[in-house]
Amino acid sequence: MAKFIMVAGTASNSGKTVMVSGICRMLANKGYKVAPFKSENMSLNSRVSVEDGEIAVAQYTQSVAAKVEPSTHFNPVLLKPKGNFTSQVIIHGKPYKNLDYNEYRNEKDYCIEKIKESLDYLNKNYDYVIMEGAGSCCEINLLEDDIANLRVAEMANADVLLVSDIDRGGVFASLYGTVELLPENWRKLIKGFIINKFRGNADVLTDGFKKITELTNIDVAGLIPYDES
């Protein structure tokens, strides 16, 4: 039985992909068998898995960090944009259909079924599964059809770390707003906040850490410095 952990974000480009890679390498270095996972990824760039199927470059790179062979189970649904609001849908590494947004919505249950198959496989074959969310985990206009964030974390009974980019400003509002807008059953999955891309003296954040914990009952689990490289 695997332990599932999801890194979700308050926005795109908050640092989820790199953070998942880092956690994968840390656990792999401790001797655990670790799998990265992103249920649904939209990307034109793909790599070949050990099963001779396509997965997103991000999950391929994360598998290198985890020191495991890349598998289609790491990215069961890959969307490759084709223009005119249409994407080629890749399921478990193989082309499935070309679908526009509304057509894809009608395939949601099938995609969830395939995501569950991958979660079951990973649960049986790995010690840890480090999941990556997509974009913001709380786009309230899209929650009903979101199969990349907390719906999948709930399916996997995953603990969720919510990461936000302080370099953009408004980090505490982003964390608080995200938590408050989530449905209660998903909100309780969040076990800690991670503040990413911080520059300067961390002492200036002390009051903010205290207040966000008072408001949400969720601790700040990590502060990641900005990497100039």
From Swiss-Prot:
CDD domains per the UniProt record, alphabetical: CobQ_N
Pathway entry: Cofactor biosynthesis; adenosylcobalamin biosynthesis
Alphabetized Pfam families for the sequence: CbiA (PF01656)
GO MF annotation list: catalytic activity
Gene Ontology biological-process annotations: cobalamin biosynthetic process
InterPro entries: CobQ/CobB/MinD/ParA_Nub-bd_dom, CobQ_N, CobQ_synth, P-loop_NTPase
Swiss-Prot/TrEMBL keywords: Cobalamin biosynthesis, Glutamine amidotransferase
Gene3D superfamilies: P-loop containing nucleotide triphosphate hydrolases
Keyword Heme: no
Source domain of life: Archaea
The keyword Mitochondrion is assigned to this record: no
NCBIfam families, alphabetized: cobQ, PRK00784.1
Similarity-based family: Belongs to the CobB/CobQ family. CobQ subfamily.
PANTHER family xref list: COBYRIC ACID SYNTHASE, DETHIOBIOTIN SYNTHETASE
Function: Catalyzes amidations at positions B, D, E, and G on adenosylcobyrinic A,C-diamide. NH(2) groups are provided by glutamine, and one molecule of ATP is hydrogenolyzed for each amidation.
Record's protein name: Probable cobyric acid synthase
